[in-house]
Amino acid sequence: MEAPPTDFFRSLLDRKSFIDILGQGEGKIGGALMPLPDGVWGMPEGMVQNLPGYSGDVQKNREEARALMQKAGYGPDKRLPVTISTRNLAVYRDPAAILIDQFKEIGIDGELETVETAQWVPKLIKKDYKVGLNVLGTAVDDPDVYFYQNYVCNSARNYMGYCDKEFDKMVDQQSMEPDPVKRKKLVWEIDHKLQEDFARPVIYHLRAATCWQPEVKGLTMMTNSQYNGWRFEDVWLDR
């Protein structure tokens, strides 16, 4: 028996349920880059909905996934056992549990393997997993940061080993494009290609918020990053 097709993964996901459960409805469905309107570079809604598995018709998509599984020799009488590996933190375990539950809908019995933090990235680098669920963030919502860091050949964080020389040329091209409108269209094409190539399946983008006491002064929140304002060199307490 040949290995089951990975194409089933495109069709099984109910992405909205991840957002409803994990983010209380606060989140967006998109590609690699931060979706609109929160992000600057996200694909237009029409491009997103045209991606395989993104139509929103979960029932129809899962029927397609079941058909792919049956074609590979799996079904109600022969379910596929799969280990889902993830980091042993709640923000990783919770979506992994939802993924396992959704796997059941198409005849896959998932078993959760939790990995301690010190071993998680080495495990990803070695590709020592069948299905790995990872939570990914980037310092700045910018294509150069995201594409070069995660997807070009030989990138240190290209954990899935995706390598397409034509893709790398497209990334270089958008980086050198001085016209912001033209660059944005190139970025959309690149992101669309990543999702079609199944380079690293994206499930959801959740929103994050920051709270602070009134006596905290001098804190400037970043408009395109969750992480780049935490040096606190200008922050003081008015007490």
Predicted regions and their residues:
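Structural transition elements
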Residues: I29-K71, L89-D94
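Short helices/loops that flank or line small-molecule/ion binding pockets
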Residues: A97-I106, A118-Y129
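Long beta-strand-rich cores associated with HINT superfamily self-processing modules
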Residues: T210-R239
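Extracytoplasmic/peripheral linker and loop segments enriched in polar/acidic and small residues
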Residues: A3-D7, S11, I19-L22, G31, ...
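Short, well-ordered beta-strand elements
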Residues: R79-N88, E111-E113
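Cysteine-centered nucleophilic/redox motifs
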Residues: F9, K16, Y92-I108
